[in-house]
Amino acid sequence: MPLGPTCGPVLLLGSTWFTVGSTTPVERWVTVERGQPLFLVLVSMIGCLADACMDGEGKCQAGYGVGDEALADYLRDGIRTCNDVSTAELYATVDSHPLGNLFQYRAWSPQPFAWWYPAGSIVAGGDEAGGELPLAVTDGWYLLLAPLSPGEHVVRYGAKCVNPDDPSIWCTAILLYHITVK
């Protein structure tokens, strides 16, 4: 599915819709079936073993090999620390009703995983060929919303993140979904 201002959830897994995140403000319109929960990504960071990290002997510059659990821990610690110091605010509303205590919904991948990315993706530099990263971990804040009642709904969510080295540099992810439940 192409990404653009009007595309909606990218994946239906079982009965759950997984919505597309963004690092810039975006507005989307989607239709879902009655009874389908929605999975929202407030903030997510992926730590992965990129080809640029590898030397000629299959070792990361940090000294770990692809199969080392220590490498997964190293990546996990790095993204966890980055999220800790950079995530300033989280917010989510459903039909103008704020959802509270969002920082309690943090989760991370307990096991490393391989990650495939398509050509033209952010990971691929926008227009390069896609590929697979043999080891990745993730850390962030996620919400699983109970199925919404039939009708029209507005779900707004996102985060404000800051650069701890220069607080004048910050980004705000504002996602606005207009959802029709059939």
Mark where each language-model region is.
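N-terminal segment immediately downstream of the Sec signal-peptide cleavage site
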Residues: 1-17, 173, 180-182
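Extracellular-facing segments of soluble proteins and assemblies that are Gly/Ser/Thr-biased and enriched
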Residues: 12-120
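Beta-strand-connecting loops/turns
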Residues: 35, 150-151
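Extended, well-structured beta-strand/loop surface patches
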Residues: 85-150, 156-182
